[in-house]
């Protein structure tokens, strides 16, 4: 907050977040998107975008893991930075068994230009992916697997198939970049980044995508033409944090209080069910965690043993 206050007191133009906006005494002129060569700049995501581009330009195969809480903008960052290099992109299906996951994978292969017969297992799925990559004429080939934890269903042997794909073939190619992503942060860390099996030390780049800072939230409101005062922006930050999706739901025609009421407390509000959805995205059995939070909420000073 002190950094936020200091930006208002300065009478000089200065760079904030290294090229994302110019801050003046009374005005912020944000540049939410601009191109520098072929580099797409995003509010609050320059460092992460640059890390992805450095991995893209590496001389050897890259295994990139991007993780962070729900709605923080992981998929948006990856697509906006790397979309021109995708040869295959796929997203897991929430709360669905193995055969549904494989059917969705088959559909993604078809959309990418490789019609295949129904897949029996994950080994077949990754074998088909190999054929797709081999057929691509792109100089750099990016495979983007979104919501990876959802694919790892019970007794599906998804992880062993992924390990085999990377260790036996993908890691030997200098034109390949595998990007995996998921909102279940604990799963990504435990099963991929800190894996003690076939994926041990295989991740070459990891990105923990965090919410916007308070200053970045102001930049976003200026870009969206939301004429809120700094007091209102600070209040919204105390309520919603810096989660980009939540800020994208704000409407310029409503006051901040009206926005919050409409989003969170209206039965039809976009974020009315976010509480339960957030826990469901983080944990396979969210009910226990929700009960803990609800128990703590009954006491003003919390609970002790």
Positions of the model-derived regions?
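Phosphate-binding site recognition
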Residues: 1-305
């Amino acid at each position: 907050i002190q950094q936020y206050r200091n930006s208002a007191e300065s009478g000089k133009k200065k760079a904030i977040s290294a090229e994302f906006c110019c801050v003046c005494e009374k005005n912020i002129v944000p540049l939410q998107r601009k191109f520098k060569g072929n580099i797409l700049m995003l509010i609050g995501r320059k460092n992460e975008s640059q890390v992805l581009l450095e991995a893209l330009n590496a001389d050897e195969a890259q295994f990139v893991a991007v993780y962070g809480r729900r709605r923080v903008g992981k998929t948006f960052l990856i697509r906006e930075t790397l979309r021109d290099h995708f040869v295959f992109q796929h997203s897991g299906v929430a709360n669905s068994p193995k055969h549904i996951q494989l059917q969705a994978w088959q559909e993604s292969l078809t959309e990418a230009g490789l019609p295949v017969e129904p897949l029996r297992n994950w080994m077949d799925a990754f074998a088909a992916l190999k054929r797709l990559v081999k057929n691509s004429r792109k100089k750099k080939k990016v495979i983007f697997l979104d919501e990876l934890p959802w694919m790892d269903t019970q007794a599906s042997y998804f992880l062993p198939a992924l390990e085999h794909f990377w260790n036996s073939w993908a890691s030997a190619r200098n034109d390949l970049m595998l990007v995996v992503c998921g909102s279940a942060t604990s799963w990504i860390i435990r099963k991929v980044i800190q894996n003690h099996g076939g994926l041990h030390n295989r991740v070459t780049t990891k990105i923990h995508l965090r919410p916007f800072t308070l200053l970045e939230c102001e930049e976003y409101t200026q870009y969206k033409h939301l004429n809120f005062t700094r007091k209102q922006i600070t209040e919204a930050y105390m309520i919603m944090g810096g989660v980009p999706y939540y800020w994208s739901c704000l409407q310029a025609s409503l006051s901040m209080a009206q926005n919050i009421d409409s989003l969170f407390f209206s039965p039809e509000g976009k974020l009315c069910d976010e509480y339960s959805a957030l826990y469901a995205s983080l944990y396979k059995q969210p009910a226990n965690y929700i009960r803990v939070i609800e128990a703590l909420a009954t006491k003003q000073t919390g609970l002790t043993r």
